[in-house]
Amino acid sequence: MSLVASFQNPVADAQYSFRRILKALSEPGVSVQLPAMPGFGALDSASACVLLTLIDQDTPLWLSASLNDEILRKNLRFHTGAVLTDDPSAVSFALADPALDSATLLAFPCGDEMSPELATSVIVQLENLTGGTPLRLRGPGIESSRMISPQLPDCVRDYLINRPHRFPLGLDFMFTCGEELIAVPRTTRVEVC
């Protein structure tokens, strides 16, 4: 097992990453570039940046089986103090891969009417942010509509289109591939083009 360096310039890179993540969340469907860095284990650069920027000892994290290896766990604990759990119903953040299933997705907390911000932010590391089913996004941060076509797991696409929780409840999604990030927060309406 070896520890991997985090950001090259920890303070500046974390601040820059935070601003880029905020841009992606406030402008759903806009692809943002995050700092290039080595991932941990099977993690790509963008997923590593998101975790290093947003995760700490107060944000329980669930990891999908294919990404959950010793290198990732030790690096997350060292760099972030992350509390890792196998219980999807007790997390603030989840890191998933395309094998994410519907039962796990629906087990993530979606907040409640008094505290919708307690919903899980789901980071899904994808093979590609293009070439999937074309989706039209509407809502806050989008002037009229925006099109995206990430190669989403079926359960995530179905969740986004059918939103099983009434507003303001729901999950926030961040899709990563390489050094790129696209976000679709729970306030965004999604339909197939």
Which residue stretches match the model-derived regions?
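Internal, well-folded beta-alpha domain core
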Residues: I71-A183, T188-C193
